[in-house]
């Protein structure tokens, strides 16, 4: 890595994972999600700077899973820019009628993860993406309940 190269890290759940490869195959290393699309655009636009794009999204992760692997899969990579999209699986768990307070635990864990990151990597820029649910498949049947619970 040269002095000019910037590390751009994508973190999150399956939406970030996008079926990424777990080896060095350049055709699949970033997956086929928004991380790939953004890396393609920025890689082209800033080709002379040779940015390094890393995708560490893991399908099925909740914020607690992300926090458990944070040192290895985020802090140690020392990203210049860190994009996080997490929370869809947490929302699913809330809809499964898990114990009260799940929303509070999600918020506390996420805030702790972010504050720890800013403490250890104060110059890292953060891009936080809001988790979302689409009205399709499993959510379509109970869409009004999803909307009501997620909007509160």
Model features per residue range: what roles?
Residues 54-62:
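Short beta->alpha junction loops
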Residues 24-44:
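Short catalytic helix/loop segments, enriched in acidic residues and glycine
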Residues 2-28:
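Short glycine-rich His-centered loop
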Residues 2-3, 37-52, 65-152:
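Alpha-helical cap/lid subdomain in secreted, periplasmic
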Residues 11-14, 59, 86-88:
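Glycine-rich beta-strand-to-loop/alpha-helix junction loops that act as flexible
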Residues 26-30, 58, 98, 102:
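Pocket-edge positions in alpha/beta enzyme catalytic cores
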Residues 10-11, 55, 128:
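A structural signal for the hydrophobic beta-strands that form the central parallel beta-sheet
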Residues 22-30, 139-144:
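Short, flexible/disordered intra-domain loops and linkers
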């Amino acid at each position: 890595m040269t002095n000019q190269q910037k590390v751009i890290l994508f973190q999150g759940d399956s939406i970030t994972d996008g079926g990424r490869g777990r080896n060095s195959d350049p055709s699949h290393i970033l997956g086929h999600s928004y991380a790939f699309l953004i890396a393609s655009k920025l890689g082209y636009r800033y080709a002379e700077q040779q940015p390094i794009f890393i995708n560490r999204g893991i399908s099925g992760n909740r914020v607690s899973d992300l926090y458990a692997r944070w040192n290895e899969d985020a802090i140690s990579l020392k990203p210049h820019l860190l994009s996080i999209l997490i929370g869809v699986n947490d929302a699913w768990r809330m809809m499964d009628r898990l114990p009260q307070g799940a929303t509070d635990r999600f918020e506390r864990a996420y805030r702790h993860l972010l504050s720890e990151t800013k403490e250890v990597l104060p110059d890292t820029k953060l891009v936080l993406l809001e988790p979302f649910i689409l009205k399709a498949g499993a959510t379509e049947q109970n869409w009004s309940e999803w909307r009501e619970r997620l909007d509160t």
